[in-house]
Each structure stands twice: as C-alpha cells, then as structure tokens.
C-alpha cells in the first residue's frame, strides 16, 4: 500500500 505522511513519519 502507499504510505501516507502520517505513516512514514513512524520510520
């Protein structure tokens, strides 16, 4: 799935 900014910030 495509990551949203709210998801990739967790990296």
From Swiss-Prot:
The UniProt PTM text for this protein says: ACE hydrolyzes Neb-ODAIF by sequentially cleaving off two C-terminal dipeptides.
Print the keywords alphabetically.
Metalloenzyme inhibitor, Metalloprotease inhibitor, Protease inhibitor
Q: Does the keyword Metal-binding apply?
A: no
Q: Which GO MF terms does the UniProt record name? A: peptidase inhibitor activity
Which residue ranges run through the membrane? none
Superkingdom of this protein's organism:
Eukaryota
Q: Does the keyword Lipid biosynthesis apply?
A: no
Per its database record, what is this protein's job? Substrate for angiotensin converting enzyme (ACE) in vitro.
Family that this chain belongs to: To the N-terminal part of insect vitellogenins.
**Annotated protein name in UniProt:** Ovary-derived ACE interactive factor
